[in-house]
Amino acid sequence: MLQESISGRIDLLWIPVFRFASRAGCALALLLPLCPSGLAHAGQLTVTVVQSGDGGAYQDFTNALRNALLNQNIPLAVTGINKVIPDSGLVIAVGMKAAETVAASDAPFVLNVLVTKAGYEKLLRNFPHRAGSHTFSAIYLDQPVSRQAHLIAAILPDRHRVGLLYSTPPGELEQIRQEMGKRGLRLREKAVGTQSVPEALQELLLDSDMLLALPDSAIYNNSSIRNILLATYRSRVPLIGFSSAYVKAGALCAVFSAPEQIAAQVASLIRQFSETRLLPAAQYPQEFEVMVNERVARSLGLHVRSAIELRKGIKDEDGSK
């Protein structure tokens, strides 16, 4: 049964976004020369990747970035949050722990990746001297609201009530309301408040056709996600996730960006930075994937479009803006 499958797969889920499995043989603090001589020329840009941890999506990103920079004559050093952070060149902070560590350092140029928009905005509040310049930026891990709204409207066109449960109102709440409204969707909002997450969720599900999950760790975490997925399944209200891990565990679908896609975007920004020594404003991922759990759809009696069709629809809308 799907319910048993959900229960069995929850242990595989890494929250908030990726499952970071440790990998044998992963060594940090390695210098990975990308120029033929293995040495940086005088005045040449150096790039240091600071990872929040070993393996998993952190290492996937770093490996993909190294490959994307091949033949670009840009040395790439890889280190961890417990090492000395360089005070020159460009530093790529991978994950929130690395972002916090690097923001507190003397690194002159910092690009943050695998961090959510809310996480990045928190960094700017905690380190205000980093704000308002071309020396500190990010590529968000989460997706633009428009992509999420398009996915919801396209995958379940006959359903219109979208439940949104949060601990504190998300910064883009007004934009969520607008994007949903443009597509004929009605947002059903509920703050957890003094209730427990299960109590608040159960009330919300009674008035929702689907549930939109956002990266809110006070609600969607290792302790609660199993019960949330089971509650949505029992109520026959599909969950719209925000990562591939959620879809594999029992969410109906998600739009997300893989570490490799973000790495390609970072490589492009590095090439620009090598010429201008300026970082662009923080931005959303350019490339993305859509994943659909067809088994969940069948179990809930839903007829949904393929992930390929859904992704194409979102891409077409992105291109028209």
Regions found by a protein language model. Give the residues of each.
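N-terminal secretory signal peptides that target proteins for export/translocation
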Residues: 1-20
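Generic N-terminal simple sequence motifs
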Residues: 5, 12, 29-32, 153
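Short hydrophobic alpha-helices and adjacent helix-cap/hinge residues
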Residues: 41-321
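Bacterial N-terminal signal peptides
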Residues: 23-36
